[in-house]
Every structure is written in structure tokens, then in C-alpha cells.
Amino acid sequence: MRTLHVDLGERSYPIYIGENLLGDARWFAPHIVGRRVAVISNETVAPLYLETLLKALQGHEVTPVVLPDGEAYKQWETLQLIFDALLKERHDRKTTLIALGGGVIGDMAGFAAACYQRGVNFIQVPTTLLSQVDSSVGGKTGINHPLGKNMIGAFYQPQAVVIDTASLKTLPSRELSAGLAEVIKYGFICDEPFITWLEEHMDALLALEPTVVTEAIERSCAAKARVVGADERELGVRATLNLGHTFGHAIETQQGYGVWLHGEAVGAGTVMALEMSHRLGWLSAAERDRGTRLLRRAGLPVVPPAEMTAEDFMEHMAVDKKVLDGRLRLVLLQGLGNAVVTGDFPREILDATLRTDYRALADQLGDE
């Protein structure tokens, strides 16, 4: 078992990473302040792991709240089901919420914790690779709006993150690849040696070799913790964690939430960010292609939806949290391992990026 820390003064918290942590009270008891707990999960994860988690919560009065599964349910109506259950069972301010599931459950349970009686404690128990390496760490919580992804929410930190790597054994391969999009992101934005490590270990990651998976999660969480510790509320460097996300969120919104998995959209969006960085003269063609190959090896789409036009992208990208004073800002790369957030780019470069034939670029890479 490995422990990392997110350093935020009085709101600091541990990240526990290991196998078979879910049923062990040691990782939960120190972070539960009262007698009552509400476990927020979904119809896919609860049958797999709720019973195991309940073993760690013996001695507490537990209310399970099982929600529909999927990005399409990351909305106000589903959030209301959490509040309904908490109020019906008379949960008070000493209640601890536990998010048992992927990113959707973590985001909604965290937002519910931020809102319920103006704030109660919560613990993240992420069960997908994407949520383990990204969304469970850093305190971003919220729901989607029909006009934009994650536009309603709050910064609200958990008391702990408990990452049981054994939960990945039941993860579908498509979800595993989606999580690898966020793992690869850390190499692209701040850790070029990690890119080389991922190239060398991608087959082992896809095969879920335990030591390799644990190292990938630890390195990803350590990078996320450093960035969040330096910029909790995304006023500066934390925005670099959104590499590929502005393009990716446009894909998710246009296609309908849940049609493309978040990580899949980030994968294609990252290829677009690589291409734009190349067009600006910040990345060589070889670096662009290296990044694209790694994403493709992870099983991610490297071509955005063929039916999406440049105008479609611009319509959705205008509703983005990084837009300031009406100006679109993007996360781009000035070399692999060096991300920047900028709105200082020629509009024609962005337009050319949106109109690029990504299928032709992918075909030029050839087979692995």
C-alpha cells in the first residue's frame, strides 16, 4: 500500500493506493466523523463492491444510494435523488458521504456533499482508472448542463481518496483505455520521461499487470497532487490539466453525454491539441506523431467525429470554463512535457486545426 498527500493546509488529505483496500476499516475510520454514512454508488458498481465496502463500515449506520449508471445521468434530477435519500433518512451535518464508483459518481457525490446542509464530509472511492488518476483527486465536483459539461459545480475537497486497484479487474477494456487518456496527459503536460515509460509499459498496462498499474496510478496522482497543491482553484497552472478537454468536451456535448466516454473524447481532443501546437511551430511533426501513436496504442480514438464541423466545435467551445472575458483559451504544448494555457493564437490556426483531416493523419502513421 502506498500513501500520497494533497497538501492544502487544513484541507490536506491522503490518497491511499493498493490492492484489496475496500473492505478494510483502517482506510475509512479515521475520516468518518460521525455515526452515519451514506454510500453513493450506481447500478453497475454497487452489485460488485457495495457489500465489500460495508464490511469496512461495520459499526456505522449506512444508507446506500444507488443511482442510474452513465454520463447521461450526471444532471440535476439525479443529484436530487441523493438529497431526497439524505433528507428522508434524516442525515445531519456529521454524516459522511462515500462516493463508490467512477467519475460521474465522484463528481455528483462530492457536489452533494458540498451542498447538503452547506457542507458535509466525503470520501472518494474511485473504481475506474480515469477516476483513480484524475477526477477523485483535487476537489472538482459538479454536474453537466445541456449547454456545457461540468458547468454547475463547486471546488470541495474530500477527506481521503481510497484507490483499490483490484476494482480494475472488472473494468471493461473500453473504460480502461478511457482512463489511460488521463494517464498519458500527465506525461504530455509535465513529465516527458513518463511518456517514455508509458511507451515501454503500455502492453503491461492494458494487461493490468499489478505493479505496472500501481506505478502508473501513483505517478499520475503525484502529478495531480502537486498541481492541485500549487493551484487549488484553477487560477493558473491547474488549467494545464485540461489538455485536450476543450476539444473533447465539445465532442461529448455535440454527440450527447455518454455516447463517447470522457476519456475517449479527451483522447481525440488531445490529438487536436497536438496538431494545433504543431501548426503554431511549438511541436515538431515527429513529436505530434509520437503523441498520437501513444494514444492509439492505448486503444483511444485519434480521429474526432467525422460529422462534426469547425462550426460545431466553435459553438460548444465558446461554453468552456477557460473562456475569460469572451476569449477562448486553450491548453497547448510547447514541446512534449511542457504545457501552456494561452488565448494568444491566430484564429486561422485554430480554424485550420478544426478543419484538419485527422483520418488522413492517422493513416499516415501506419500500423503498429
Swiss-Prot record:
Record GO terms (molecular function): 3-dehydroquinate synthase activity; metal ion binding; nucleotide binding
Pathway(s) the chain acts in: Metabolic intermediate biosynthesis; chorismate biosynthesis; chorismate from D-erythrose 4-phosphate and phosphoenolpyruvate: step 2/7
Predominant subcellular localization, coarse grouping: cytoplasm
GO cellular-component term (any): cytoplasm
Key word NAD present: yes
Segments passing through the bilayer: none
Reactions catalysed, as given in the entry: 7-phospho-2-dehydro-3-deoxy-D-arabino-heptonate = 3-dehydroquinate + phosphate
Alphabetic keyword roster: Amino-acid biosynthesis, Aromatic amino acid biosynthesis, Cobalt, Cytoplasm, Lyase, Metal-binding, NAD, Nucleotide-binding, Zinc
Taxonomy, superkingdom: Bacteria
Subcellular location: Cytoplasm
Binding-site residues, NAD(+): 69-74, 103-107, 127-128, 140, 149
SUPFAM superfamilies reported for this sequence: Dehydroquinate synthase-like
InterPro entries tied to this protein: Dehydroquinate_synthase, DHQ_synth_AroB, DHQ_synth_fam, DHQS/DOIS_N, DHQS_C
Co-factor(s): Co(2+); Zn(2+); NAD(+)
Cofactor note as given: Binds 1 divalent metal cation per subunit. Can use either Co(2+) or Zn(2+).
UniProt GO BP: amino acid biosynthetic process; aromatic amino acid family biosynthetic process; chorismate biosynthetic process
NCBIfam families (UniProt xref): aroB (TIGR01357)
Similarity remark: Belongs to the sugar phosphate cyclases superfamily. Dehydroquinate synthase family.
Function: Catalyzes the conversion of 3-deoxy-D-arabino-heptulosonate 7-phosphate (DAHP) to dehydroquinate (DHQ).
This protein's name: 3-dehydroquinate synthase
Source organism of the structure: Pseudomonas aeruginosa (strain LESB58)
Primary gene name: aroB
